[in-house]
Amino acid sequence: ISGHRATYGGGIYLDQASIYIKEGGIINDNQATKGGAIYTEGTKAGSCLLNIEGGTISGNCANESGAGIFAICSKGTRDDMKVEISGGMIAHNYSGTGENLEENAIVLMGEDPNLTEDTGFADLYLSGSPVITGSVTLADDYCAADSKNYSPLIYVHNSFNVNKPILISPIHG
């Protein structure tokens, strides 16, 4: 999947559905405002699963955020948006413009002004030996105002092999 442009999900827009990316899958040279390669959303009306077992996500751009993957759970529960990565490569994807350009692999987000411990967020599950370069951003528009500081979670399975340290960065508000 290459050379596409969109507001959300330059290569793939996934809404309340599941997709599996296997060895040989290539998503490159796509552009969007959010989710240069992939934009995926789960809600309480329907869950979403992005499962990456292989393939390459590279050379994608996002004007705002999530050049590789932008995953959001909108007013759902904890299990409504999962990103599972066990293989493949996510590298050389860039968000922003000019001097604000940065390598950004994944943005995980929740969107619900009524935060509780059951509030849904896009959560990341890591296992195997994927290559991920650039930042992984945990974001939420409502967390800063809430003293409980709920946020997206990253689950790391004991089979996860770190090829290179992954930069985790929070964004609130």
Give the ranges of each region predicted by the language model:
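N-terminal accessory interaction module
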Residues: 172-173
